[in-house]
Amino acid sequence: MNLYIIIFHLANDADRRNNLVSLIKQQGSWARITDNVWCIKAENKTTAEIRDVLGPGIQIQKDERLMVVDITKSAWASYYLPKEVADWLKG
């Protein structure tokens, strides 16, 4: 199981943001870190494959940002992360 972090910045469009969040949740088990930073656990997917589902799925614009990073073997530390999110990341 791989762990990915998804970071995005969209124009102020609640419908498109909700669509992106829905697409993120469809990629695998997920946790919301902040409003614009999510983590997913998924098998048999690459960062490019995830990006290519999310970006076109919301018709991302040139002035917006979307980044997918594989953090499977990365160390992490945090302050004030909700316990359920920290537990999810550890699990």
Where do the PLM segments sit?
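Compositionally biased, intrinsically disordered low-complexity regions enriched in proline and serine
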Residues: 5, 80-81
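Generic secondary-structure microfeatures
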Residues: 8-12, 24, 44
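A mid-sequence interfacial segment
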Residues: 82-91
